[in-house]
Design a protein with these regions (language model features):
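Conserved N-terminal beta-strand and adjoining loop/helix that marks the start
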Residues: 1-18
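Short connector loops at helix/strand junctions that flank enzyme active sites
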Residues: 4, 12, 33, 78-82
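Conserved Nudix-box catalytic region and its N-terminal flanking loop in Nudix hydrolases
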Residues: 16-54
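Nudix hydrolase/Nudix homology domain
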Residues: 28-30, 99-156
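Conserved beta-strand segments that form the floor/walls of ligand-binding pockets within enzyme
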Residues: 32, 66, 84
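Structural detector for helix-capping/boundary residues
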Residues: 36, 50, 63, 107-110
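A short coil-to-beta-strand element that immediately follows conserved catalytic motifs
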Residues: 59-69
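Active-site-adjacent beta-strand/loop module that shapes the phosphate/pyrophosphate-binding cleft
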Residues: 71-94, 105, 109-110, 134-145
Length: 156
């Protein structure tokens, strides 16, 4: 069994979040928020900012990211943990894609959940139970990010 640690950013542009379609490898064709593995000697928040820049060409300071939640899920090789942060960018910000992705879009959090994470839709498409469990976990943390974003800072 292995232990995997990654960090991801729910990046807000106004009321929309950035999602990116994977080109190949892990979950090819899936739509995800930017993120990736925490490198040796790197703090998770630094990884989140680095991955956002590498995957989308958008620079944010690690200090500008807010911790939201930790998502844990089984990978077949062990348990993976992804630390989720909220971030924001200017309304005119555009994302670029790297070789890991073939497309990106900005959409509301609820539209993302309904379009890509809906359990009934995934079951109809024959998704495995582990894929459905992961989608439910992603939907949970996206909702937590939306809730935290609208809450007063003193309650976050």
């Amino acid at each position: 069994m292995s232990f995997e640690l990654s960090a991801s950013v729910v990046l807000w542009r106004g009321d929309e979040i950035l999602v990116m379609k994977r080109a190949g490898g892990f979950s090819a064709g899936g739509w995800f928020i930017p993120g990736g593995h925490v490198e040796q000697g790197e703090r998770p928040v630094e990884s989140a900012a680095r991955e956002l820049f590498e995957e989308a060409g958008i620079a944010v300071e690690p200090e500008a990211l807010t911790l939201i939640d930790v998502m844990s899920y089984e990978t077949g090789r062990g348990t993976a943990h992804t630390i989720i942060y909220n971030g924001s960018c200017a309304d005119a910000t555009e994302a670029a894609i790297n070789e890991e992705h073939i497309y990106h879009r900005w959409m509301t959090a609820e539209a993302y959940i309904a379009r890509f994470l809906d359990e009934a839709m995934l079951r109809t498409r024959g998704a495995s139970q582990s894929a459905i469990d992961l989608a439910n976990e992603v939907a949970r943390v996206i909702r937590a990010a939306a809730t935290a974003r609208s809450a007063p800072l003193s309650s976050v």
